[in-house]
């Protein structure tokens, strides 16, 4: 259903992109571009509040939610498929937009709390309404998104504007009725989960029982019931008695997709811990520890920084775990703890530039990674608005670029290649020419179709597979 919602964020009709994840050599992705830009982008002024900080499809893929640094959530709805226009089958339009979080100030600690949306997670749809969790650094909120196309009329004690009428002026008794109205999408906060995290929240994950979820910060992971806001259970606590002895922090956490007692969390030291809540209430002792031994020949000043895991994801079956560190994506088998079964180099050509990346703080960027619906393809972002895709079966990979400069309606996205040294071909880009201010940190893949969403700073691109 086309939405008739006022676009309060200025996210309007720019372009939208379309892509195919068949990792062929030449014609790979088509782009029916309609990416969404903020008004400031059109004037070539980028505001930090407009930078997209998270992207997430719902369980059916019909809705796509984005959060930004300004604390806003924008939800896009997929257009109904039109047989006469098959190229528009992956088109999404603005469905609802609302302010999820506001900036706050902690007077006890004299700290500002940013409104930036760190994560969004959808709950499975149970009725006509949609529910999602959004979080900033300190507070998680449960939102209900619902449609309304009727309004009540004919109140006895209220006039048409909702003002209370003088009972003395009421001369007849009316029966209220429902009248049709233009479709309106409402977002209302149903729960607010706060005051449980001392440090910044980096992850939220909904459990497979759909009754609980967990939130993770730098040193602790808490378990919540979706119906209870004033109490949570601490299930992981790695804070040492003496903070000077702190050697690592929690970077990401996720529940197993099917086993409600099992979850994993990653650390800044490059380790992944699998925990079972049935073993103890406080999961300080992990069930399994996944860690790859470091090659002494590759040891450097930056080794610990680039080994920090920025994202961890179970595959759909729950058999494998995917992790992303600064230079690589790794796939781990739950039955093999000592090394990953697959390692993919995302941008190994940056290894010689780690010193300059450290100086400009880019080495601390946190890239996410996603599976496709069948777990056969992996996607993650890079610099220069590049994103990488790896086919696990054919072992082929491709680098693609999300940018307005090379976007035309239903154009074909050509693979890009980075040249490290020597003579550069016409279609290659030198590693020295990469723009490190243009980075793709956040991506999402439709749960069942070849449709992906890519956030490039304050632009959102949506790609679908090529339509002949």
Curated annotation (Swiss-Prot):
Highest taxon of the source? Eukaryota
Q: Name one GO cellular component term.
A: protein phosphatase type 2A complex
Alphabetically list the UniProt keywords. Cytoplasm, Cytoskeleton, Membrane, Repeat, WD repeat
Reply yes or no: does the keyword Nucleotidyltransferase apply: no
This protein's record includes keyword Nucleotide-binding? no
WD repeats sit at 47-86, 112-153, 196-234, 245-285, 304-342, 359-400, 435-468
GO terms, molecular function:
protein phosphatase regulator activity
Write out the annotated subcellular location.
Cytoplasm; Cytoplasm, Cytoskeleton; Membrane
Oligomeric and partner information = PP2A consists of a common heterodimeric core enzyme, composed of a 36 kDa catalytic subunit (subunit C) and a 65 kDa constant regulatory subunit (PR65 or subunit A), that associates with a variety of regulatory subunits.
Q: Its function? A: The B regulatory subunit might modulate substrate selectivity and catalytic activity, and might also direct the localization of the catalytic enzyme to a particular subcellular compartment. Negatively controls the initiation of oocyte maturation.
Q: Which family does it belong to?
A: Belongs to the phosphatase 2A regulatory subunit B family.
- Write down what this protein is called: Serine/threonine-protein phosphatase 2A 55 kDa regulatory subunit B beta isoform
Provenance organism: Xenopus laevis
Question: Organism classification, top ranks?
Answer: Eukaryota, Metazoa, Chordata, Craniata, Vertebrata
